[in-house]
C-alpha cells in the first residue's frame, strides 16, 4: 500500500539571506536535524543523496525508510514579470512589499535510478521524496523560509492490518505520516534557528573581543 505524507512550514530567521543560504545548502547538516534521520550519504559520482529514516507503522512496528534525492539550487525574482516561478510564488505570500525581489530556491527531487540499498533489518522500503525550500530576503535583513515536502512510501501490510479496508487504512496512514512529517519539519527548523542564533551570538562575541 502506498502511503503519502505532506508537510509545510514557515519560519523567520535572524540572519541575512547569504548566511541562511549557506546553512540550507549544506544538505547533510540540514537533513541530520530531522529527528527520524539515522544516516545521510552522498554519492559524489552520481550527485545524489541517500537518506535513511526510522519510523513506525500504525501498529508501532519499526520501519526503515530510504530515499534518494538530488539537490538543485537556483535564484528567482519576486517582481520580474518574466520569472514565471517568481510570479507564482509571489501570489502565494502575504505582505510581498516586506521582501527584496531576489530570492533563492533549493529543490530536492526524487531519483529513479539509484544504488542498491542493503539492509540488515526487515521492513525496509525505498520511497520517493521531494522538497522545496524558498529563502526570501526581508527588508529588515532577516530571512523568511518556506519549507514544503512530499513523500510516498509503498510498504507491505502485516496481519491484522491487511484485513482492514484499504481505503480506510490508507486514509489513516496518510494522516499519521503527514503528522509525523510536520512534527519532523518543525523540529528541523527549530534546530536550524537554534544553530543560527548560536552562530550569530558567537560572531558577536568574536567581534566584540577584537
Predicted stretch roles:
Residues 16, 33, 37, 134, ...:
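Generic recognition of cysteine residues
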Residues 1-88:
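Hydrophobic ligand-binding cavity/cleft-lining segments
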Residues 84-174:
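Beta-strand/loop substructures that line and gate deep hydrophobic ligand-binding cavities in soluble
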Residues 163-210:
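A conserved amphipathic terminal alpha-helix motif
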